[in-house]
Regions:
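Short beta-strand segments
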Residues: 19-21, 43, 84-86, 113-114, ...
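N-terminal glycine-rich anion-binding loop in soluble enzyme alpha/beta folds
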Residues: 1-51
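A glycine- and small-aliphatic-rich helix-loop capping segment at beta-alpha/alpha-beta transitions
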Residues: 4-10, 90, 94-111, 177-182, ...
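Glycine-rich phosphate-binding loop
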Residues: 73-92, 170, 175-182, 187-229
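Solvent-exposed alpha-helices and their adjacent loops that cap or buttress functional pockets
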Residues: 10-12, 34-35, 59-63, 73-77, ...
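Phosphate/nucleotide-donor binding subsite
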Residues: 35-79
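Glycine-rich phosphate/diphosphate-binding loop of Rossmann-like nucleotide-binding domains
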Residues: 16-18, 23-27, 130-196, 205, ...
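Short, acidic/small-residue loops that bind anionic groups at enzyme active sites
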Residues: 93-127, 184-194
Length: 229
């Protein structure tokens, strides 16, 4: 994280990075690098949220943790974004409790970029909502499309929903109900169902699924990658 922050401020002169954590440890790591010091500020946080801790209880109980302090900085307008390598559950819970959701957003998804033959695709959702509703999958599709177009620079990104076949009538109840809703969306480039084998081929720029399926896809990617490498 510290190296990433240093690389960021060295590459972009207009940004400022706040490193939130145990001050002595962070400064010791920073001392290894040369960087524009006016663009980096260390914010001391004395507590740590462990990976195994219940997220909501940890957010409420550890006010001086880096996750809680960082999220409050976003809420108070001191920062525009928050990045963490800590507990995913705590970041999600804290994001909703402290920062809040954007207007109209039902649930926040987890959306990593995954490698394909044609570049990166966005897998959304991969772990936040294992029992998602059709309306939420539609929102994920729209959010993913906006991200891929505006952040990744892909014009009119292709959106596909993960299914057990390419035919519209296939799938479980969730996919069957979501499919026509996605098809009716005029603001996304919905290409229909995609099978798991289509994902590494880059068939879709935005791969939509509920978190149970998405997490299986993500962990399979990780396992295959480590096996082959």
């Amino acid at each position: 994280i510290v190296k990433g922050a240093v690389d960021a401020v060295c590459a972009e002169k207009k940004i400022k990075v706040f490193l939130v954590g145990k001050e002595e440890q962070v400064k010791a790591e920073l001392s290894k690098y040369t960087y524009p010091q006016e663009q980096v500020e260390v914010v001391n946080a004395t507590e740590v949220i462990a990976m195994a801790e219940p997220p909501v209880a940890a957010i409420r109980g550890k006010k001086d943790s880096s996750i809680v302090k960082g999220l409050y900085m976003v809420r108070e307008g001191k920062c525009d974004a928050f990045v963490s390598a800590g507990s995913t559950g705590a970041v999600l819970a804290g994001g909703q409790v402290i920062v809040g959701r954007s207007k109209g957003v039902e649930r926040p998804p987890l959306a990593p970029l995954i490698p394909t033959e044609k570049g990166a695709s966005l897998l959304i959702d991969c772990g936040a909502n294992v029992d998602a509703k059709p309306s939420q999958l539609v929102q994920f599709a729209k959010m993913g499309s906006i991200y891929m177009e505006n952040v990744m620079g892909i014009k009119n990104p292709k959106v596909g929903i993960v299914n057990i076949g390419a035919e519209e009538e296939k799938g479980n109840a969730l996919v069957k109900e979501t499919f026509p809703m996605l098809k009716a969306c005029s603001d996304i480039n919905f290409i229909g169902s995609i099978e798991a084998r289509d994902i590494p081929a880059g068939a879709a720029d935005v791969v939509v699924c509920e978190a149970f399926v998405g997490n299986v896809v993500l962990k399979l990617y990780e396992g295959v990658g480590s096996t082959l490498i």
